[in-house]
């Protein structure tokens, strides 16, 4: 997310607060942080695959190797639709990586701007509990991609004789990725293997967040870097809630990280002031840079 996207998202945040009703705060966890027991290598690999979605599509072709993964397929132009790359990875299976906000695209920025909560899309609404709400802009962006993603997953799972599907995203791409991870678990044969999300904004209301926990909580891995402000929007009191168990890298871009159990854990990121720049949102995650359009192209897995 570049500076233009930052400004637009902040303005959208202000407008949403002024225009919309406030909701009672949902529960926030007070559990103490614990050591991260997940394997770190898949985070490192996943970060490189999502960084590559920010690179110019004309600069690489199918067959590109990134760590243990081979690039297979892409859709999206970063404008009308967010870019999505598919890879075949030894550690992750068929990996779906989704680009974050394109700061040079008004359409991409507007996905971040549309804060109003909506019902789940008709494609998957039957699987969601009554009362679940999803941020409109993120759902619009996902719905533009979902049919092509599902077709590609079926094709490459068959061709590669691969049962595992992993969803990866950064920033807006993490929000879209959370919807994709849920949808794949609910509607695709074989379901979801893992999801790795970096700099995740809030996507839905407490009913949605709790359904995420019940459905893919044991498969979801998501991380916040330093004083990144993006995971704090849409604001909690506007009715949005994160799923459980974020990993907080603090100080930002370091190798110091802890897992914060439960939803909206009060002992982690709420304890430090936000920094409204990209130094942490686009930074080093588990030894790999996610730098957006200003990052490393091709991505370098585990280079930091």
UniProtKB/Swiss-Prot annotation:
GO CC, alphabetical: extracellular region
PROSITE patterns documented for this protein: LIPASE_SER
Active site residues according to the UniProt entry: 171 (nucleophile), 228, 281
Name this polypeptide is given: Secreted mono- and diacylglycerol lipase MDL4
Glycosylated residue positions: 102, 161, 253
Signal sequence region: 1-19
Enzyme class (EC, first level): hydrolase
Origin superkingdom: Eukaryota
Disulfide bond sites: 55-297
GO biological process: lipid catabolic process
Annotated Pfam families: Lipase_3 (PF01764)
Keywords, alphabetical: Cell wall, Disulfide bond, Glycoprotein, Hydrolase, Lipid degradation, Lipid metabolism, Secreted, Signal, Virulence
Family: Belongs to the AB hydrolase superfamily. Lipase family. Class 3 subfamily.
Catalytic activity: a monoacylglycerol + H2O = glycerol + a fatty acid + H(+); a diacylglycerol + H2O = a monoacylglycerol + a fatty acid + H(+)
InterPro entries to which the protein is assigned, alphabetical: AB_hydrolase_fold, Fungal_lipase-type, Sec_MonoDiacylglyc_Lipase
Function description: Secreted lipase involved in Dandruff and seborrheic dermatitis (D/SD) probably via lipase-mediated breakdown of sebaceous lipids and release of irritating free fatty acids. Shows activity against monoglyceride and diglyceride substrates, but not triglyceride substrates and does not exhibit regio-selective production of diacylglycerols. Cleaves oleic acid from 1,2 isomers of diolein on both the 1 and the 2 position of the glycerol backbone, resulting mainly in free fatty acids but no monoolein is detected.
GO molecular function: hydrolase activity
Listed PANTHER family: ALPHA/BETA-HYDROLASES SUPERFAMILY PROTEIN, FUNGAL LIPASE-LIKE DOMAIN-CONTAINING PROTEIN
Enzyme Commission code(s) on record: 3.1.1.-
Main location (coarse class): secreted
């Amino acid at each position: 997310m570049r500076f233009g996207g930052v400004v637009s998202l902040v303005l959208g945040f202000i407008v949403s607060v002024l225009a919309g009703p406030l909701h009672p705060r949902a529960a926030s966890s007070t559990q103490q942080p614990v050591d991260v027991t997940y394997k770190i290598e898949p985070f490192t690999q996943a970060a490189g695959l999502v960084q590559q979605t920010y690179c110019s599509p004309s600069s690489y072709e199918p067959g590109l190797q990134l760590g243990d993964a081979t690039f297979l397929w892409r859709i999206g132009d970063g404008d009308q639709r967010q870019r999505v790359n598919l890879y075949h990875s030894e550690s992750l299976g068929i990996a779906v990586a989704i680009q974050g906000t394109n700061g040079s695209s008004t359409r991409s920025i507007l996905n971040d701007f549309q804060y109003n909560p909506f019902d789940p899309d008709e494609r998957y609404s039957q699987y969601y509990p009554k009362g679940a709400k999803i941020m409109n802009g993120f759902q619009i962006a996902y719905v533009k991609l979902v049919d092509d993603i599902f077709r590609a997953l079926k094709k490459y799972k068959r061709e590669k004789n691969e049962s595992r599907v992993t969803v990866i995203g950064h920033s807006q791409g993490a929000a879209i990725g959370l919807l994709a991870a849920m949808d794949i678990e609910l509607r695709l044969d074989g379901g979801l293997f893992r999801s790795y999300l970096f700099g995740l904004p809030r996507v839905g209301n407490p009913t949605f967040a709790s359904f995420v926990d019940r459905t893919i909580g044991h498969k979801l891995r998501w991380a916040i870097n330093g004083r990144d402000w993006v995971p704090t929007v849409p604001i909690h009191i506007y009715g949005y809630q994160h799923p459980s168990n974020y990993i907080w890298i603090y100080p930002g871009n370091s190798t110091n990280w802890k897992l914060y159990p439960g939803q909206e854990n009060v002992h982690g990121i709420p304890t430090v002031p936000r920094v409204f720049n990209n130094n942490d949102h686009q930074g080093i995650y588990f030894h790999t840079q996610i730098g957006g359009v200003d990052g490393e192209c091709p991505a370098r897995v585990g280079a930091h």
